[in-house]
Amino acid sequence: MNKLELMKTANEVRKGIVTAVHSAKSGHPGGSLSAADIYTYLYFEEMNIDPKDPKKADRDRFVLSKGHTAPGYYSTLAHRGFFPVEDLTTLRKVGSYLQGHPDMKHIPGVDMSSGSLGQGISAAVGMALAAKMDQADYRTSISQLLIARPMLLHKGHILADLRDICSLLQ
């Protein structure tokens, strides 16, 4: 995709966020809207993923540690083709698979369920270490909110010798 196409896609992701949060009459639109460009770039340009085979062994992984921004994550996954965009209107409804925090057992494309802030770093580091130990060729990315503690990154790596794990800070 060229830059203009990515910008248009990010705007569609934003529309999906607003639609989902409005339909649910609850949610955290600010964090989701601010992450739309990052999620769009990762899912449409950078990550090795296949919506038709979301559990493919050599796919890149993504961990949404700040699960309350799930509407942005869901909109990105829907626009990438993991599930129908129309399902965004079911956010937080009884019986919907799109609840307040992502659940890896029920949502196609979700690699890790989200819970308490900060838990995603350990999960992402574990995934990156597993890839290194297995000599696998996938990368792990994480969206993490760090309150009043900015993290210094060196070329996208949090810890030395872990394969391709980066933290996206907002």
For the regions a protein language model found, what residue spans apply to each?
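Boundary/activation segment at the start of structured domains
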Residues: 163-168
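Histidine-centered catalytic micro-motifs
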Residues: 29
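Cofactor-binding active-site loop characterized by glycine-rich and histidine/acidic residues
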Residues: 5-6, 17-21, 32-162
